[in-house]
């Protein structure tokens, strides 16, 4: 088969279409002549990534050293006019920046900020906003709490008391000889301190009460004891009435509400103080009886202060007191003879 030879202006039908058609980004290069390409290479390249930022089509080749192109100095004759220049002013002088250019940049930045603030103010402009804020203030809420749907307890910000010592610190130094012993239950994960509580019949750890709670428990216990005594008297009087008949119908005492802590708490507090005073008086009386029985002196005997081996506690020159035990008119001396001379002997007659 003879080889196909296309005529002038005729395309070869055997060449695919994607080869015949040139891409759009190569059409300008292909259609230009070699002279035009050489001229373009001297001024600009075909693909300039910073073409949208250039005021002119000229591209500056930064690979060539061009230091000092922005320097524009003022001269008086042949002497350059020097000013008090800072780092920024020297940098602007080297790159050729002027103050007017910086002012234009600042103006553009401020205009953009103002436009953003104005847009945000329009978005937040709501007639019900003030009423909504007042309602939140009345409810002691904040916008952040409403967004997160969480209201923090103000007690969470309180500092822990320094005397609040955790149980695990006691557990570090605890041993059978210590007064404070921690028993840790791994099942319930509770540290049980015998000094702070006890285990009840249900194997539950009950803390010991302190302060007002302890006083209330003592009052309740005392009221219960008084009520039990009164109940015994009522039962005994009732039995006597049943046994002896109705000779004394009014001898059975009625329920006494003054013995109830809930009915009369103030009266119970006064009774507890009265019982405490009586108990204290009995203990003092019994102690006095014992002292009288064994002929013991109730007054405490004066005990001499113990002497130490220091020089301050040693007596010299038959003195009964040390030098410095007496002071008068700005002078120190001996208390026994009231002499101010340190080397003098004691002249006291006692």
Curated annotation (Swiss-Prot):
One Pfam family from the record: Slu7
InterPro entries: Slu7_dom, Splicing_factor_SLU7
Main location: nucleus
Keywords: mRNA processing, mRNA splicing, Nucleus, Spliceosome
Annotated compartments: Nucleus
Disordered as annotated region, ranges: 28-58
Role this protein plays: Involved in pre-mRNA splicing.
Family in the record: Belongs to the SLU7 family.
Protein name: Pre-mRNA-splicing factor SLU7
Organism: Candida albicans (strain SC5314 / ATCC MYA-2876)
